[in-house]
Amino acid sequence: ELSSKAITSKTRNGKDMLYLSFMPEIDDVYEDSEKEYLFLIDISGSMMGVKLSETKRAVIECLKQLDEGDKFNIIAFDHQFEVMSAHALEYNEKNMQEAEKYINSLRASGGTEILNPIKFALYENTEKVILLFTDGQVGNEKQIIDFVKEHGKNSRIFPFGIDSNVN
């Protein structure tokens, strides 16, 4: 059985925004397990302005939904990438405040290179939930898909397109 939710809102510049969520019921055993979440945030030049500000807001809202015991980290990328922390952080109030401060400090510049942050995210081959926020149109999507197929068997990746031109 699916649980669904729809939220409509206006962006700061008056454009309509729609968020849809469809969640299957999951066994309690899976529900209670601690998870590791990685948030990959595109900070390339094309994300400047409302795209990046709305992405920041969305990531902060996602972080607030984590449970005690969950772990998380944030990877910001343009033509290179940086990691908020050298290791996954346990979700708690202090780390949430640090994450908000880090997210709000991000600035857009550079090109879009998605493969290297994905390689980093999947390096340990442990079970992770990866949320990818990008407006990118990449030329190496086959290489990215092939890498994820080979190395991402234990992880779930959820891409969020921040525009209508994402590939």
Where are the language model's segments positioned?
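Exposed acidic/Ser/Thr-rich ligand/metal-binding surfaces
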Residues: 1-167
